[in-house]
Amino acid sequence: VLKELADQPAHDLVNKKIVPDQIVPTGGYDIENLSDPSRRSAYHGSIETDRYGRSIPKQAHGTQNLDDYTSSSHRIMNAAVDLFDRLIDPTLLIRRLYIVANHIIPEDTALQKKDRFTQLDLFTDYAAEEQKQKANAADLERERKLQEAMLSIRKKFGKNAVLKAMNLEEGATAKDRNNQIGGHKA
């Protein structure tokens, strides 16, 4: 589900021609974690009160900086999953997940900012680094073209016209979320 949640904003970023360099995944825990005696005894973290006055485990929240400004769904998904695995308590039930993209700028501005300075040293093979950067740039360009093709198909035939295999796995919610309007059944 988290990969689906990270993939959708990446497509929105490509559509709007904007790029972030930071993502913030947040996971809120379910109230059942503290009402179930076995889970309650296993949990030793902080407890907060929700807006209804109920006690719930404190939500997991973290920030992951990306290497560069990007709208690559692959890089955003990997960063979100890595941070999620470090933050979320696997013994607790999760009620809600959301991902926020920070430090958003237009793509053309990001291309101008790409010329960053690097500290040189004697032990790095800069020819190999340059080859790696060229291969990475080619991969990002190929992914970008694929994302744009998927967006054009989705605009013409609907959001469920093109789905990834992860959207068809058991427990996946993207297909259902694509049929909703404002989070409600259409």
Which role does the model predict for each range below?
Residues 1-186:
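Basic, low-complexity intrinsically disordered segments
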